[in-house]
Design a protein with these regions (language model features):
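Rossmann-like AdoMet
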Residues: 1-128
Length: 129
């Protein structure tokens, strides 16, 4: 099934970041984000501009590596923490981290609407617009 997504402005940037994580997972493998790959495989969207922006790709991957390490370290020392992921976009960290009691993804209403299509709430993961 292919999901047609039409966004512009700030909300559109979330598609570029999830694409960078999926592409990295499929190619060089500095990170592994299989949920991002699942999302990209479902979308009907032209990612040609994201393919041309190597600096953006590198920045997304560097930020992902740093944030994954910080969140993992924090959760290891604070079992059962509640996580508030502000400006979450299509971040998929909640699906690979362990040790939290509840994860809240917060963003603009149009972003959360896309999240609800592609990454619906489940169990201890909630979305707030």
């Amino acid at each position: 099934m292919s999901e047609k997504i039409t966004l512009s402005g700030v909300p559109e940037t979330m598609l570029q970041t999830v694409y960078a994580r999926a592409k990295e997972t499929k190619t060089r493998g500095a990170i592994t984000d299989n949920k991002a790959v699942e999302i990209i495989d479902r979308l009907d969207y032209d990612f040609s501009m994201a393919d041309k922006d190597a600096a953006m790709h590198s920045g997304v991957i560097a930020r992902t590596i740093v944030l994954d390490k910080l969140v993992k370290t924090y959760l290891a020392g604070h079992g059962g923490a509640v996580v508030e992921n502000i400006a979450c976009g299509l971040d998929t960290r909640c699906y690979c981290m362990k040790g939290y009691s509840h994860w809240y993804n917060l963003d603009l209403p149009e972003t959360i609407a896309v999240r609800e299509k592609l990454l619906p709430e489940s169990g201890n993961i909630s979305q707030i617009a």
